[in-house]
Amino acid sequence: MDKNNQKKFVLVHGICHGAWCWYKVKAQLEAAGHSVTAVDLAASGVNMTSLDEIQTLKDYCKPLLEFLSSLGSDDDKVILVAHSMGGISASLAADIFPSKVAAIVFVAAFMPDISNPPAYVFQKLVKDVTQEVWMDTVFGKPDRPLEFALFGPEFMAKYLYNLSPLQDFELAKMSVRVSPFMTNNLAGTISFSEDRYGSVTRIYIVCGEDVAVPVDYQRGMINDFPVKEVLEIKDADHMPMFSKPQELCALLLEIADKYA
């Protein structure tokens, strides 16, 4: 592919997951000739940061922020592709480095607005969720107020991987790690800014069979903070990179052609 047509994708995972969850998407985008970086956030995937070192959202997102910081002024802008809780991480990155981001693509992701604290969109969904719904998910409360979570296999099977291949679910069971839970204690209470994060092009990909972040909730976030374009993968569960990787890649390539 001509260098002028090559796009730069940066893939941002959600909690308990890591760069590993993007293996199908990364391979397909690279096969199409594009540059793809899948980041392990702190204490995720193979990143060896200890949970004790994560006190803030910036701490958790440090690998992503360091990658964007390393890009020179001559580098092309990146397309941030954010899944699930990765939407909050990508939004922080865009708030800090708006000039380096061509667009954020929210894939069944929590999308902060510019009037509420960053964690609000997640806390609003889970505030009434009972322990029965979380099933075998394990929560830890250390001495400090930051909370941690580890998705259990029963929860993942029912809510995250319900339409995904069994092999990918097995990969997830072996690979998930304890992650910081998105609270105001972690993310702070200051909203992202209108002139930085708010100025970056945002696209939302709705996953039509998502039972973790239901379609009505996905569309509610879009209504509350409208985006440039809304696309949908009708038969995707919460993990479209596993359940509908080809459809997801096709949309990402379409987005890259339009916005990067």
Curated annotation (Swiss-Prot):
Pathways involved: Plant hormone biosynthesis
Function: Methylesterase shown to have carboxylesterase activity, methyl indole-3-acetic acid (MeIAA) esterase activity and methyl salicylate (MeSA) esterase activity in vitro. Required to convert methyl salicylate (MeSA) to salicylic acid (SA) as part of the signal transduction pathways that activate systemic acquired resistance in systemic tissue. MeSA is believed to be an inactive form that needs to be demethylated to exert a biological effect.
Family: Belongs to the AB hydrolase superfamily. Methylesterase family.
Induction section of the entry: By pathogen infection.
Keyword field contains Hydrolase: yes
Entry annotated with the keyword Kinase: no
Gene3D superfamilies: alpha/beta hydrolase
Organism (species): Arabidopsis thaliana
Regulation of activity: Esterase activity is down-regulated by salicylic acid (SA).
Protein's name in the database: Methylesterase 7
Keywords of the record: Hydrolase, Immunity, Innate immunity, Plant defense
GO MF: hydrolase activity, acting on ester bonds; methyl indole-3-acetate esterase activity; methyl salicylate esterase activity
Encoding gene (name): MES7
Active-site positions on this chain: 84 (acyl-ester intermediate), 210 (charge relay system), 238 (charge relay system)
Catalysed reaction equations from the record: methyl (indol-3-yl)acetate + H2O = (indol-3-yl)acetate + methanol + H(+); methyl salicylate + H2O = salicylate + methanol + H(+)
GO biological process: defense response to fungus; innate immune response; salicylic acid metabolic process; systemic acquired resistance
Note: Expression of MES7 can restore systemic acquired resistance in SAR-deficient tobacco plants.
EC code: 3.1.1.-
